[in-house]
Structure formats: C-alpha cells, structure tokens
C-alpha cells in the first residue's frame, strides 16, 4: 500500500490506471527514449530523496523553491537522473521534468499538459516506430519525420519545451542522423559515378526529390 496521500480514492485509482497505461506504452518504445517510468507499486520508492527521506520522513517544507507536497515522481530521465513528476493539484495531472540545483527545485521543463496527453504521445511514437518498421530492425527514418511527430505534439501542448523533448528522444534522432549521413555518402558516390537522379532514386528506393536534397547537402 502506497504512503502517498492522494486527494481521494478516485484520484488514486486514476493515477494507478494512468501509470499502467504509461508503462504499457513505454515498454514498446523504451529503447528509443531517454526516460524510464515507475509502476504504481514503485511510487513510494521513487519519492525517496524528494518528498521523503530513506526512513519515510517528510522532506516537504514551507520554504520557497522547495519540494511541493503535490509533486509525485513517476519517472526519471535516464541521462542525468532528473525526476519527472505529476502535479496532483492540477487538472489532468500535468507532467514536468525538474532539475535540482543550489538547494532549489525552481528549475525545470514542462513536458505535457496531462498524463493522458503524455500517454497518447508515447502511443504516437510507438505507432511511428511500427509504421517505419524500426521495431523490426529497419533504421530508415528522417529527422524531418521526427520533427513533424514532435511538433504535432507541441501544438497540442502549448507550453511544452522543444529542447527537452529533443533530449528525451535523442536515441531516435541519432538513428535518423546516422541514416541520413549514410544516404548522403551513397548519393555522393553514385553522383560521382555519373548516375542520374532518377537512377539513384530507383537504386536507393527513395523519391527523386529526396535524392536532390541529399545532393544539395553534399
């Protein structure tokens, strides 16, 4: 049984359901994102060092820029370990990434306006990976495709920071960059061999417009 003081039984059930959905979607994309999500059963463990100490004593105070009693850690960034939280006092439980510095929790980035929106974005990422057959081992994705995916999410979450999501999705952007660099080398070699744009497009199974774009880069 969790030690977290939810505002109601309904809220507890809602958070539990959302975390189950979040873990379900995260499992599909875990290899391609820089964050991990806790289960409902792990919630108490994830609060240690933030709202409680190792003995379960509260670390919440009334001092400015300290930990808020309504903040619940549900995940963390895998690159630097920063906590990802929900705010129990806000409708939909908006999600943010916090950064601790100089004994203050005043810094951080907004990730999604609700748990539902966060879950839906993970679904979108999973659908994208399925469509592009990345989960089957193909690594043929473009940076502009990821930009479109991310910007569509940002349109629905107006206060979300692009840079923080760029960091959280860097494994995917790295795959795209590696693929594009490989294609640039192939296009350059074929062009030097005297092949026409239409020939290169046919041989690489891409559109002539894409070949032209690679030629402009090299």
Language model features: what each stretch is:
Residues 1-90, 192-193, 197-203, 207-209, ...:
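A surface-exposed partner-binding patch
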Residues 76, 82, 116-124, 189:
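Short, hydrophobic/amphipathic alpha-helical patches that form generic packing surfaces
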Residues 94-133:
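Compact, glycine/acidic-enriched structural inserts
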Residues 118-169:
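Extended, acidic-biased charged interface segments
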Residues 163-183:
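Short, Lys/Arg-enriched anionic-surface-contact patches
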Residues 178-195:
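Short, amphipathic alpha-helical "recognition" segments used to contact nucleic acids or chromatin
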């Amino acid at each position: 049984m969790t030690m977290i003081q939810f505002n109601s039984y309904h809220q507890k059930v809602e958070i539990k359901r959302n975390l189950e959905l979040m873990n379900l979607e995260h499992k599909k994309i875990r290899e391609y994102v820089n964050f991990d999500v806790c289960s409902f059963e792990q919630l108490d463990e994830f609060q240690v060092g933030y709202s409680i100490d190792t003995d379960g004593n509260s670390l919440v105070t009334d001092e400015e820029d300290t930990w808020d009693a309504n903040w619940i850690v549900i995940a963390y960034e895998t690159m630097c370990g920063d906590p990802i939280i929900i705010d129990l006092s806000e409708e939909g439980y908006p999600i943010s990434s916090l950064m601790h510095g100089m004994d203050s929790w005043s810094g951080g980035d907004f990730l999604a306006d609700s748990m539902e929106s966060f879950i839906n974005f993970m679904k979108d990422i999973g659908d994208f990976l399925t469509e592009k057959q990345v989960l089957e081992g193909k690594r043929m994705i473009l940076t502009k495709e990821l930009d479109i995916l991310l910007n569509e999410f940002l349109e629905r979450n107006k206060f979300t920071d692009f840079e923080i999501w760029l960091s959280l999705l860097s494994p995917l952007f790295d795959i795209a960059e590696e693929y594009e660099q490989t294609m640039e080398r192939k296009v350059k070699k074929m062009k030097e061999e005297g092949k026409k744009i239409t020939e290169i497009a046919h041989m690489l199974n891409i559109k002539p417009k894409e070949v032209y774009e690679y030629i402009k880069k090299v």
